[in-house]
């Protein structure tokens, strides 16, 4: 335990301290040499950046704010950023002017018919909407009457009445066929919808007869008016059924009454055309004979022309009835009820059973109406001297009274 006891860590730290001392001495020496060199006047060799400071005045670089245009610019305000973004989004591209190409003349629309039609319908709706709403009143009244009558009758009573009516206007076989057909409609569950469809069709037929017969009689006696109206009738018959729906919805709305209105417009041309044809086909010698006996124009019309033209007129009524039935089905797209609505709902739901019920009901109803109107169109001369009440169920009831009078 003498003073000669050594610290074992001193031997390890001595070399490190010596190395640190040598390093600091070398750094001091190099600093002195650098100072001496700087004072000796050789900056180009010791300071590599001195060349840039000793450059000619003409090659002096631009200031920092000129070299960097964004260094001193203030940051854009948030409102300016949003405004520029909005302007960019809302800006429309500048239209490029294209010259007319003779080899492709119809690349662009030349006649803006769609815009004209849209503006015309908007103008009609704006100025004449009360008029079109007033047209709904008589149509709604007649439709409501037919619908209440047909849907208010019990099904057995209605079937019996229709069967007797078919027997009266046609034959006993037609009465039986009508009976079986109506029973089939009720059996498949389409009776109420079939009565709604029948009410729509009868309402449209009623107005078509009221409008079409007088118009056809007038056009049959006026060649100038017939030449003016004939192109309109051609356009009405060739226009697709769906095209009628758009202006009717704009002017009248949706529902059963607009459906009847569009059906009237669609089914009107046949009765007008065939009324004109029937009256003009009356033999000229019969007309001359009536005139020679002093018949007045009214007597000529009701006693000669209309009775002889009745088969042709009834053919027009038959065509009008068939077109009305087809249009009532199409008009189900504007919320018209009946069998067409069943078909539309079945197609929309991919329910083929429901669509089939509506389709079968439409077919049966169309066959019944077609056969009945064809029977009404038979020439009165084919019945002989018998009156309409001398046959059918009314003939059975009136026969005892007729024999008693004889």
Swiss-Prot record:
Q: Which Pfam families match?
A: BPD_transp_1
- Report the transmembrane regions from the record: 149-169, 171-191, 198-218, 248-268, 320-340, 350-370
Q: Can the keyword Cell membrane be found in this entry's annotation?
A: yes
UniProt xrefs under Gene3D superfamilies: MetI-like
Q: Which domain of life is it from?
A: Bacteria
Concerning InterPro entries, the annotation shows: MetI-like (IPR000515), MetI-like_sf (IPR035906)
Q: How does it sit in the membrane?
A: Multi-pass membrane protein
Q: Which GO terms describe its biological process?
A: amino acid transport; choline transport; glycine betaine transport
Phenotypic effect of disruption: Uptake of glycine betaine and choline is completely abolished in the ousA-ousB double mutant.
**GO MF terms, alphabetically ordered:** amine transmembrane transporter activity; carnitine transmembrane transporter activity
What the record says about the induction of its expression is:
Induced by increased medium osmolality. Repressed by glycine betaine.
**Which family does the entry's similarity section mention?**
Belongs to the binding-protein-dependent transport system permease family.
Question: What is the annotated role of this protein in its UniProt record?
Answer: Part of the OusB ABC transporter complex involved in glycine betaine and choline uptake. May also transport several other osmoprotectants such as ectoine, DMSA, DMSP, proline and carnitine. Probably responsible for the translocation of the substrate across the membrane.
Q: Can you name this protein? A: Glycine betaine/choline transport system permease protein OusW
Q: Which organism is this entry from?
A: Dickeya dadantii (strain 3937)
């Amino acid at each position: 335990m003498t003073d000669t006891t050594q610290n074992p860590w001193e031997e390890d730290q001595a070399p490190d301290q010596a190395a640190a001392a040598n390093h600091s001495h070398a750094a001091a020496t190099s600093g002195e040499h650098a100072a001496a060199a700087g004072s000796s006047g050789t900056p180009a060799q010791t300071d590599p950046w001195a060349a840039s400071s000793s450059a000619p005045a003409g090659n002096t670089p631009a200031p920092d704010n000129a070299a960097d245009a964004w260094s001193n610019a203030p940051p854009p305000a948030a409102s300016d950023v949003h405004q520029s973004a909005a302007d960019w989004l809302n800006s429309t591209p500048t239209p490029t002017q294209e010259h007319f190409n003779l080899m492709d003349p119809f690349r662009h629309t030349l006649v803006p018919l769609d815009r004209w039609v849209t503006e015309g319908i908007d103008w009609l709706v704006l100025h004449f909407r009360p008029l079109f709403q007033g047209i709904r009143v008589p149509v709604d009244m007649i439709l409501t009457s037919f619908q209440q009558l047909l849907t208010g009758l019990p099904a057995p009573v209605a079937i019996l009445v229709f069967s007797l009516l078919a027997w009266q206007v046609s034959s006993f076989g037609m009465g039986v066929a009508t009976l079986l057909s109506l029973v089939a409609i009720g059996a498949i569950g389409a009776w109420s919808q079939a009565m709604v469809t029948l009410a729509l069709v009868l309402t449209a037929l009623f107005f078509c007869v009221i409008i079409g017969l007088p118009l056809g009689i007038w056009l049959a006696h006026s060649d100038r008016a017939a030449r003016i109206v004939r192109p309109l009738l051609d356009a009405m018959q060739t226009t697709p059924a769906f095209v009628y729906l758009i202006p009717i919805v704009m002017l009248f709305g949706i529902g059963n009454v607009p459906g009847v209105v569009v059906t009237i417009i669609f089914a009107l041309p046949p009765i007008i055309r065939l009324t004109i044809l029937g009256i003009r086909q009356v033999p000229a010698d019969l007309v001359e004979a009536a005139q020679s006996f002093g018949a007045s124009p009214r007597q000529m019309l009701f006693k000669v022309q209309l009775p002889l033209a009745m088969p042709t007129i009834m053919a027009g009524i038959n065509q009008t009835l068939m077109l009305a039935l087809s249009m009532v089905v199409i008009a189900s797209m504007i919320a018209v009820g009946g069998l067409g609505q069943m078909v539309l709902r079945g197609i929309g739901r991919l329910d083929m059973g429901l669509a089939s019920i509506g389709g079968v009901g439409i077919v049966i109803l169309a066959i019944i109406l077609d056969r009945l109107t064809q029977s009404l169109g038979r020439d009165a001369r084919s019945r002989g001297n018998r009156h309409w009440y001398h046959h059918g169920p009314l003939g059975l009831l009136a026969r005892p009274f007729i024999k008693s009078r004889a």
